[in-house]
A protein has these predicted regions:
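Beta-propeller domains
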Residues: 1-4, 20-56, 80-95, 138
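A short beta-strand motif characteristic of beta-propeller blades
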Residues: 1-5, 51-57, 96-106, 144-153, ...
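Repeated scaffold domains used in trafficking and secretory/extracellular systems
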Residues: 8-13, 59-70, 107-114, 158-163, ...
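Loop/turn segments within WD40 beta-propeller blades
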Residues: 16-19, 66-72, 114-120, 163-170, ...
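Conserved beta-strand element within WD40/beta-propeller blades
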Residues: 22-25, 30-31, 75-79, 122-126, ...
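WD40-repeat beta-propellers
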Residues: 33-35, 39-42, 83-88, 131-136, ...
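Juxtamembrane amphipathic/hinge helix adjacent to a transmembrane helix
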Residues: 278-329
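C-terminal single-pass membrane-anchor helix
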Residues: 325-355
Length: 355
């Protein structure tokens, strides 16, 4: 197992699915030597498998976004105007990915930019801001039925970068390059709320919404927004109060590309266009914990695996970064050690009548 793997082409998307990371790389026409591939690597606390456990050649198609269903070991990718479902099958000591179904989920002249999948639905976003919701039915890890439920052709005026589905609230939330983040009712795709961000009232335009993450326990939404060639911020929004802003933190003075939220620790990992990984503690007032320099080139995507962070960069490198607490003893753990020591010392003294 290794902490760093060099692939043959730039990494555009990744998704952590149980003890695997699915990696989409490529970015060009296969006829000119740039292979577009979908690879599956094994993960453990000690690192990433040195070679993929399974691989799919994508020809001229560039996978740009991945979402998944960990409970079913199923994931879905955005390729051109298609959504393609795959499953990870374990046979003895070996695992492999195999294609379940390919669905034309965007119009022929559009590029599908992102998607989100749940056990009952698929939501897709396109390069022109088009938003669609499909119903899904699974049978024995295969898709038995797909139906278009609703389409909103004017959800956004620019590319939709990210979608989050919250089934229990019957809503979905989108982030777009048009500078807005919107909440929609799933059944009708009627817009319920729109939010945007500017660092100061003097600025003339909204920041691009790069990514969104949802904390279901605290009912909080996090948005990552950046200027075209400038600063990046994360804002915490209160879902109980209709997406009212709670606090904002400046992450960096350059463009950040993606983030992921660790629900176990309340920490966000953010990656930027100059090879940095920044950890943000979201408990209470947001604050930066640590900034790591992983390389010199843009890190395009990232996700937590436990407390470790998996990232993929445009210089072909797949990395596992240790937890920000790696090698440190927490105050709580130190207190437990001291307490146990005092108890043992007390028992020893009592037996030997030292005092």
């Amino acid at each position: 197992m290794q902490s760093e793997i060099t692939l043959k082409s730039p990494i555009f998307a990744l998704y952590v699915l149980n003890d695997f990371v699915i990696v989409a790389s490529g970015g060009g026409n296969a006829k000119f030597g740039v292979k577009n591939t979908l690879q599956c690597f094994q993960l453990s606390s000690s690192g990433i498998s040195a070679s993929p456990v399974s691989e799919q050649q994508m020809g001229n198609d560039v996978p740009v976004y991945i979402s998944g269903l960990p409970s079913k070991n199923i994931f879905c990718i955005s390729v051109n105007n298609f959504s393609i479902f795959y499953s990870i099958s374990k046979k003895g000591d070996f695992s492999e990915i195999y294609k379940i179904q390919s669905l034309p989920t965007a119009n022929e002249d559009l590029f599908q930019s992102c998607l989100a999948v749940t056990p009952t639905m698929l939501c897709t976003g396109a390069s022109n801001g088009n938003l669609k919701v499909f119903s899904l039915k699974f049978q024995n890890n295969d898709i038995s039925a797909v139906d278009l439920l609703k389409e909103n052709t004017s959800a956004h005026i620019r590319t939709i970068n990210s979608i989050i589905v919250i089934p229990e609230k019957k809503i979905l939330i989108t982030a777009s390059g048009d500078g807005t983040c919107k909440m929609f009712e799933i059944a009708t795709l009627k817009m319920l709320k729109k939010i945007s961000f500017r660092a100061s009232i003097e600025e003339s335009s909204n920041y691009f919404m790069r990514d969104i993450q949802y904390d279901s326990y605290n009912n909080v939404l996090y948005t990552l927004q950046s200027a075209l060639r400038g600063k990046s911020f994360i804002t915490k929004w209160d879902m109980y109060k209709g997406l009212s802003p709670i606090s904002t933190i400046e992450v960096n003075d350059i463009v950040c590309s993606a983030m992921d939220y660790n629900k176990n620790t309340g920490v966000i990992g953010v990656v930027d266009c100059e090879g940095h990984l920044i950890y943000i503690d979201t408990k209470g007032e947001m604050k930066k914990i640590k900034k790591l320099t992983l390389g010199e080139n843009m890190i395009k995507c990232g996700a937590f695996y436990g407390n470790q962070f998996i990232s993929g960069s445009v210089d072909n490198i797949l990395r596992m970064s240790k937890s920000y607490t790696s090698g440190l003893i927490s105050i709580g753990f130190l207190f437990k050690i001291i307490l146990i020591g005092l108890v043992v010392f007390h028992i020893y003294n009592k037996k030997n009548n030292i005092f």
